[in-house]
């Protein structure tokens, strides 16, 4: 018995403790189910419930599951592309589905025969989102509602983080009539390592794919046209639809808005297939990007290197004055990630000339991300040291006139605490194809060239060395501003017993292609039971994408010890 007194009046209520202690509890449920992007895929969610007592123990009673409308009032017929198996409690969603909201209601009986029920609201969402008040009849058809209370959670799979308010006039016919304003981040779970075409109707500032304080996201809006960034739009005062290509390295696409009004976002996955021949993309600063640098010359003159072009096409992606931070925030790494096709190669190593405020071990985390990002997008990675110091004012030590030898190979924190450490940590990963020591090889090639001074037309070793020294306008740059191409040519082609960059690329690619792997053929009966397994030695160059049918699966793996697929899905 409970006695309640309010304003001088007393009411006595008798409660049945046994009845109230029994209830229904969902033992498995999901509040959000994503519409798959792939026509062959099906997204499922499991729902189950039990009648429990006051101590939470399952009483073992029957519970039925039914589908009701979003308000949990009337039974609801699921639209095309969505089905519910009540006996198994499975909601299945195909790519034919459209966004909708419904309720899964669980019903059972208490010990005295009274009806017990509990419900969970389920949002089936695609990747088209209408931002606004969330009022009934305000969400544009085919879009999923995002309102001030739609906070991002792992379970929901989409939503916002930050402070927002709803503004504008809600309309079911116009997705831009209302919007959310403020400083906030929108997140949506997507498939890891894929490229997405994202349409955003907004005003204000936008940054995509925040990683860390150092890699604070690709800046997508500028006040005016400029050449510092790529993949951006000019900031507008009015809500305007903009389109961006966004590579997503992890499984969450994030868009950070500042001083913004956001009306809608649509996200579409872009499928990419392997090129007829792999591409080599090169991450770097001006030491590879500028006129006269080895990467600039190799990309321009690669027809002169048929042994390399038979294996891959080379691209110079160096950008002057960039560091690990700005190469990312200004979109240049994204530009590579966008263009990567399965089986492409990325070289990473010439990005330490401009420290960008980093020192010591601080280089390693951004470099690790660069590697992880390229691998996630389907590329293989070759790590390199970077080009040598020139023997100019302040760097006279680079050439020793007594021993007639160069020592320009850099040994700073970027190199010794960054790129070389990463290679040692990852060298057993088959997707890290190798390490090319550009700086050390340059020293050795220069030294052999100097030792061969007479053959090369010089009076003595120092004269030959001076010809190399004269290629450098400063300690970083060589072969530019009309200077001799000798230093760059020696780096590219090597000299004597020292290999050049071209032959090293050929070596690494050839060794990778000839690496052994295992072809695994599995046979299944109609019930999915494995009935036969065959393994055959193969080479990486022979590997194909997984071939599936109802009764068979053919895949290629590096080895049984290293169960990594040669070609990722």
Give the location of each predicted region.
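Proline-enriched interdomain boundary motifs that mark the N-terminal boundary
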Residues: 22-30
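Alpha-helical cap/lid subdomain in secreted, periplasmic
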Residues: 48, 332-484, 489-493
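Serine-esterase "nucleophile elbow" of acetyl-processing enzymes
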Residues: 131, 255, 268-319, 333-346
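Low-complexity "stalk/linker" and mucin-like segments enriched in Ser/Thr/Pro/Ala/Gly
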Residues: 26, 35, 57, 68-88
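Compositionally biased, intrinsically disordered or flexible polar/acidic segments
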Residues: 126-292
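Extracellular/luminal low-complexity segments enriched in Ser/Thr/Pro
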Residues: 1, 89-99
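C-terminal edge beta-strand
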Residues: 11-18, 116-125
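Short, solvent-exposed loop/turn segments at the edges of extracellular beta-sandwich modules
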Residues: 7-9, 109-114
